[in-house]
Regions:
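Hydrophobic/aromatic beta-strand patches that form the interior of the parallel beta-sheet core
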Residues: 6-8, 34-36, 63, 104-106, ...
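N-terminal beta-loop-helix "entrance" segment that forms/cooperates
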Residues: 33-57
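Generic recognition of short, well-ordered alpha-helical segments
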Residues: 18-22, 47, 75-79, 160
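Short, solvent-exposed amphipathic alpha-helices that sit
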Residues: 18-29, 125-140
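N-terminal beta1-alpha1 ligand-phosphate binding loop
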Residues: 1-32, 36
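Helix-loop-strand module that forms the ligand-binding subsite of alpha/beta enzymes
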Residues: 51-134
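Glycine-rich phosphate/pyrophosphate-binding loop and the adjoining helix
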Residues: 28, 136-204
Length: 204
């Protein structure tokens, strides 16, 4: 049975992001994918907890899609976590609603990848910065996968990387939906688009 994928998209200024718009276009027409524009749906950040918990129950894969803001998510995704991932639902006694589901982050970052290192401008790797989300997923019993990032997003369009990244994004979602992605092998990568062809068995 195909997996059902929930993409929680959070970008407060999407009109400024060619890279994220390319990724959204790549998702068009994909069956089994539910896209939720959190800023569009909750412009005052008054999140419907019951609705969001219902969405989580109905899907097998949960994706946070966002631009990296100050080494974290945009504000609405933090609000979403604080309200939706309740004790007794997502964790704690009888809180098993998310157990076994797959979780990962798909984000864009303005800086180049080399900036995210011990010797770089940002001092930490992307995976290190995402550890709070990784631990959240693990506490909820989810299968955490490494991120699917686009570095240097500000120049990705003019450098011809945005559309290629968007194409890889679509291929990844299709593979997750169709259960053709080796989750164990994917978990060993530092990022999902590092060896995507190999993970998808292209040329094997």
């Amino acid at each position: 049975m195909p997996r059902r994928i929930l993409v929680l998209f959070a970008h407060p200024t999407i009109h400024r992001s060619e890279a994220n718009r390319a990724m959204l276009r790549a998702m068009e027409g994909l069956e089994g994918i539910t896209l939720v524009d959190l800023y569009g749906e909750y412009p005052t950040m008054e999140i419907d907890i019951d609705r969001e918990q219902g969405r989580l129950r109905e899907h097998d894969v949960v994706v946070f899609m966002f631009p990296l803001y100050w080494y974290s998510t945009p504000a609405i995704l933090k609000e979403w976590q604080d309200l939706v991932l309740e004790y007794g639902f997502a964790y704690g006694e009888q809180g098993t609603a998310l157990a076994g589901k797959v979780f990962f982050c798909a984000m864009t970052a303005g800086a180049r990848e080399q900036s995210y290192s011990a010797d770089g401008l940002n001092h930490y790797t992307l995976n290190e910065l995402l550890q709070p989300l990784e631990q959240t997923a693990r506490l909820c019993g989810m299968h955490y996968l490494p991120p699917f990032p686009l570095f240097g997003a500000r120049t990705a369009l003019e450098e011809g990387r945005a559309e290629r990244h968007a194409g890889d994004w679509r291929r990844l979602l299709e593979a997750l939906r169709d259960d053709s992605l080796d989750l164990a092998a994917a978990s060993r990568q530092s990022r999902l688009n590092e060896n995507l062809d190999e993970l998808l068995g292209v040329g094997a």
